[in-house]
């Protein structure tokens, strides 16, 4: 190859965000299509360990813009792909998301969501389903639903209704889950 072709290939890589590392079979089978893993950092010391059993519960309490996917859902997708990208097998990825307070609207059925948000469709539905398919436990606070006058039947079918987010968070942490957020 001549120098011009090499320079063009390198420029294209920089322009489109490709790293210089060799892609592995794992990269082709990331659990969350359309979500890149965290970018590689040359020399980084702390990396996901394929031998560790990751138990993580994300507290989804923040209010999101009604027309946008909840940012914490994107973070969960990125985290799942980062674990997979670094060789952590599916059997070692135990991820839960607990929706409560302002985050509870993200798991509402589309008709209920539209009624609460001036006709806006629930932008979270597809990603929630993909997360569930990737093995993420999706939970919502039953007390929060009562407070918003929402029936359990008005929650998406991929989401488990629990008595109270506080109890869910405590129970998961007692089972060894590490809490992220909220």
What is each of the regions a protein language model found here?
Residues 49-65, 108-112:
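Acidic/histidine-rich, surface-exposed loop or edge segments in extracytoplasmic proteins
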Residues 89-107:
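Acidic helix-start/capping segments at beta-turn-to-alpha-helix junctions
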Residues 1-8:
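Bacterial N-terminal signal peptides that target proteins for export
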